[in-house]
Amino acid sequence: MGLLRGGAACARAMARLGALRSHYCALLLAAALAVCAFYYLGSGRETFSSATKRLKEARAGAAAPTPPAPELARGSAAPASGAKAKSLEGGVVVPVDYHLLMMFTKAEHNAPLQAKARVALSSLLRLAKFEAHEVLNLHFVSEEASREVAKALLRELLPPAAGFKCKVIFHDVAVLTDKLFPVVEAMQKYFSAGSGTYYSDSIFFLSVAMHQIMPKEIPRIIQLDLDLKYKTNIRELFEEFDNFLPGAVIGIAREMQPVYRHTFWQFRHENPKTRVGDPPPEGLPGFNSGVMLLNLEAMRQSPLYSHLLEPSWVQQLADKYHFRGHLGDQDFFTMIGMEHPELFHVLDCTWNRQLCTWWRDHGYSDVFQAYFRCEGHVKIYHGNCNTPIPED
């Protein structure tokens, strides 16, 4: 009887073990299906929030597999980026994501804009180099018509044989505008050209509130203008995040024209010894938003930055500096940078070598070169105000 009883107990234990193994296999299968679903977002009409939820579920189950070719996803979010690859038990390497964002709107019947996009994307992708575990995530903010233009261009410039992994994510401009408006409404009257003009739309303040719009799974992102030409591997620009001092939330280059010498004229008249609007290296010439490194995690955690978004603070600073601009987010960052420069990591001019010389011919020829000077090997050319970019 003792032998029979022991045999029955052993049989029951083996049955339970088999059930547990079946349950474990089912969980692994579910996780794999979730990951596959993420990589095929482009075939459906995913929303921003649903894609993020799907991503979280996939990451909870297993590491994402290597995609066979660049993906064209709609409103999706990618895994969090980090400075180094992380290894799970068993030696599995977790992908490291790098996020770039560009505005691509009103492009369908705009040949000059399409030409700029071609120059920017072709030079960016031709020089980009990433490790096997790294993924470049290209985010585009656009409406339906421009989205199709971008897809056609990317299919040409991103062949399946690209030397690195790349995902493309589209964000609907109308959806983001609705989310942005409550945050930036108060500041638009100080930094917009007027009703119905290009910068009067709240979407052009996206960088100001990006930390509230993007999911927390994206801790860092670089926002780029389309009138750029890249002369080096964009991967190197992400290393600038490591140079941020404590308290800094945004990396941005100086404005290379006396734009803000002009804008701050009244404050400068009332404060003749101020550095506001003066050229570098001693002065504060303001910022140019063509290339911006946004540490979204730091922006979310900064009490100072959060306070500066409040309408009362915006009005207080605008009144103090007699500030009325027309360049959207660039104006906002310039104004708060005069008051709180510790919020900003200043990029070298070679990361945003601006070429526009408009102010040289409009009253500031005597001081122009002090702002425009930039020494060193250019990494990114910026053909602002439709200035031609040098050929290779």
Curated annotation (Swiss-Prot):
Reactions performed catalytically: 3-O-[alpha-D-xylosyl-(1->3)-beta-D-glucosyl]-L-seryl-[EGF-like domain protein] + UDP-alpha-D-xylose = 3-O-[alpha-D-xylosyl-(1->3)-alpha-D-xylosyl-(1->3)-beta-D-glucosyl]-L-seryl-[EGF-like domain protein] + UDP + H(+)
Spans through the membrane: 20-42
Residues reported to bind UDP-alpha-D-xylose: 103-105, 226, 289, 327, 330
Membrane topology note: Single-pass type II membrane protein
Effect of residue 326 to A: Abolishes enzyme activity
GO cellular component: endoplasmic reticulum membrane
Cofactor(s) annotated in UniProt: Mg(2+); Mn(2+)
Residues binding a glycoprotein, per UniProt: 330, 359, 384
Biological processes per GO annotation: O-glycan processing
Impact upon substituting residue 329 to A: Increases enzyme activity
Protein's cellular compartments: Endoplasmic reticulum membrane
Phenotypic consequence of residue 266 to K: No effect on enzyme activity
Region (Interaction with target proteins) residue spans: 262-265
Cytoplasmic side: 1-19
Chain positions recorded as Mn(2+) binding sites: 225, 227, 382
Side of membrane Lumenal, spans: 43-392
Cofactor note (record): Has the highest in vitro activity with 20 mM Mn(2+), a concentration entirely out of the physiological range. Can also utilize Mg(2+), suggesting this may be the physiological cofactor.
EC code: 2.4.2.62
Phenotype upon changing residue 324 to S: Reduces enzyme activity
Outcome recorded upon mutating residue 384 to A: Abolishes enzyme activity
Family statement: Belongs to the glycosyltransferase 8 family.
Name of the featured protein: Xyloside xylosyltransferase 1
Organism: Mus musculus
